Amino acid sequence: RDVGTAAMLKLRYPDEETSDYGQAALLPGFVDLHTHLENAVLRGIVHDVPYATWIMTMRELSAKLDVADWYDSAILGGLEALSSGITTVADITASGASCTATQKLGMRSVIYREVGAMDRRRVDFAMHQAENDLMHWREEVDSSRVTIGLSPSAVFACHPEMFRKVAQFAKKENVPVALRLAGDREECDFVRYGSSPFSVHSMDTKRGFVEIPPWLPTGTTPVNYALNWGAFESDNVMMVH
C-alpha cells in the first residue's frame, strides 16, 4: 500500500502492472446496514399502502416461499447489491439463506439470525433453535468475511422477554445484535397505546397461545420499552429503525 502520483508510483514499482481507467473514480464498496436479501424476489409486489399493511402482507407472502426460493432470492438480492456497488451487508434472516448466499458471492456480511415468539412459553424454545443455528452457520462461513449475530423480531411479533434473552446470550458469546423497534408511527402506537393494525393482526393470526388481547399498552416509546427489557445490555448493538 502506498500513496503518490501515478508517475511516482510507477517509478517505485516498475514491475507492477498498471491499468488506466480514464476519468473513473475508484471508491471502496458501499455498506448496506439493513437488508433482507431472502425477500428480494418480493420487491414491487406490495406498494403504496400504509406501513402496517405492507409489512404484514410481506410476511404472509414470504411464508409462501420454500427453502430453495429463499436461497434463490438471496442470491438475486446479493447480485443486485453488488451491481450497485454494495459489497457489505448487514442482513436479518430467519432461514439462513443470506448467510449461504453472501458466502457464495464473496461478499462481506453480518448475518443476524432473527428470533421471535409472541408467547412467553415459546421464548426459550425459540432461543434454543436460534442458538443452534448460529453455531451451525458459524461453521459454514469464512469468518474473515462473514459474522453471525442475532436479531429479535420486530416488537409487534416478539415477547419482551426475548429482548432480555438475546442480550444475555449476545453478551456471553460476544455476538452482534440488530434491533428493529420503530419502523413507523403505527408500530410506535402499538407499543405505546396497544392500538394500530398490529394489535388487530396479532389477534387475527392467533400466534401461539397468546391471550386476548395479546398486547397491553406500555405507555412508553419503543426505545424505552426495549431498554426496560435489557435489549441494550450486550456490547455490540445496532438499531436499524
Label the predicted regions.
Residues 1-27:
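Histidine-rich, glycine-flanked metal-binding segment
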Residues 23, 34, 85, 102, ...:
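Divalent metal-coordination and catalytic microenvironments
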Residues 25, 43-107, 128-143:
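Alpha-helical scaffold segments that flank or form the walls of functional sites
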Residues 29-40, 176-185:
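Histidine-centered catalytic micro-motifs
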Residues 31, 87-88, 108-110, 145-151, ...:
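Structural preference for beta-strand elements that scaffold enzyme active sites
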Residues 36, 94, 114-118, 151-155, ...:
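Active-site beta-loop-alpha junctions enriched in small/polar residues
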Residues 41-72, 110-113, 185-234:
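Active-site gating loops and adjacent loop-to-helix segments of metal-dependent hydrolytic enzymes
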Residues 151-167:
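Active-site glycine- and acidic-residue-rich loops that bind
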